[in-house]
């Protein structure tokens, strides 16, 4: 039997000419110590109107009551002290000439106060035309069929932990091509990435879209999101981040079901295919001319969802979470001494209804014309974290990766390039404000700007909240127990006690 040799017909893939830089995990170059700190915030409270900002009628720019809704994100920015400036008890922990200290997040607990409750939202002029699930007669629309409608939103519990802000995504109107531009046409859509800030709205069942540009009738969604952007965390982008700073880990729980089924009012933009496009009788058969069905109703169907049951059995909050291995290359290292915690929770969504008398008198009988009704929503948070002290060696490979990731980290460590002085002596004037002395330099030294000053976060200062006494705090005791540190201390204490007891008995003999 003879064999026939044939040349390879497939494509040959060659490796790239330039090597691809490999990003190291923080566990490969950071040395962890056995020193742990506990930090917790104060009781964080906020009160406001659940649907919109209440503004001053005389001055539109002045907000009298801010918008505080259970359907908003709470984006906390925790500021941690610089460990390199700590007065450590043991100064032999690290060598400041060869190492720098950083924090690593090992555990956290997001505490939430207030009882569980379901909050409703809605619109006094909601764009819906009757119920389409159990219709008794064919729907005939008019010029304005909007109704006063309310519903409960989709149930959301979520938090994302990282050392940079959480990234979100939403759909917005894109710029159309010149050939596709025109009045009354549906705009093209594009996916937008942006930072999730404190006060941004979550998806409550109508999708993560920009309602300011995609809802011109101001009636398609509820009042709390009709003039806002609903964002959803971009888990795919954060999971594929090369450094993994935006999301160490996250927890998420969402649930909803379609409760009511409606149809939108207005002209249908994309008509059902018919004879005009060569699709006659493919989708519908026309009705007789004397029937009401001869004039087709709207086919823009949509549901109003419900978050259903709210229970303590499925709560993500008021319980500890421990970080052993993050999803990315950053295993919990808090670069630049800060931590971002983005929270969404509408299981405590009760809106207070407050009634007051318009004339200041105590009413003796009910009269709705003499009563004013107000809405308020309150939220209560408390954040506790466990931090581990870690060392970063000042080696060329490590510094090169940190500089490529974020050069400001090295600037804060005062590792920047120091130029050689060109003149050993400089001029220093006295009486700078005197008319006889030359004017001082008008260009002061540039101050380092906050890279997140353009964003809105709930800043929590923990620079003076750290403690080594972990057993004095609830989260600290839980950490000692799960890490086995408490048991080891007990064994050492009991063994020391037995040794001392034996020594006393020998002396008595």
UniProtKB/Swiss-Prot annotation:
A molecular function GO annotation: structural molecule activity
GO cellular component, one term: host cell nucleus
BP terms from Gene Ontology: endocytosis involved in viral entry into host cell; virion attachment to host cell
Primary localisation category: virion
Domain of life of the organism encoding this protein: Viruses
Keywords recorded for this protein, A-Z: Capsid protein, Disulfide bond, Host nucleus, Host-virus interaction, Late protein, T=7 icosahedral capsid protein, Viral attachment to host cell, Viral penetration into host cytoplasm, Virion, Virus endocytosis by host, Virus entry into host cell
Location of the protein in the cell: Virion; Host nucleus
Pfam hit, one: Late_protein_L1
HAMAP family per UniProt: PPV_L1 (MF_04002)
Job of this protein: Forms an icosahedral capsid with a T=7 symmetry and a 50 nm diameter. The capsid is composed of 72 pentamers linked to each other by disulfide bonds and associated with L2 proteins. Binds to heparan sulfate proteoglycans on cell surface of basal layer keratinocytes to provide initial virion attachment. This binding mediates a conformational change in the virus capsid that facilitates efficient infection. The virion enters the host cell via endocytosis. During virus trafficking, L1 protein dissociates from the viral DNA and the genomic DNA is released to the host nucleus.
Family: Belongs to the papillomaviridae L1 protein family.
Subunit field text: Self-assembles into homopentamers. The capsid has an icosahedral symmetry and consists of 72 capsomers, with each capsomer being a pentamer of L1. Interacts with the minor capsid protein L2; this interaction is necessary for viral genome encapsidation. Interacts with protein E2; this interaction enhances E2-dependent replication and transcription activation.
Protein name: Major capsid protein L1
Organism, as annotated: Human papillomavirus type 49
Gene this chain is encoded by: L1
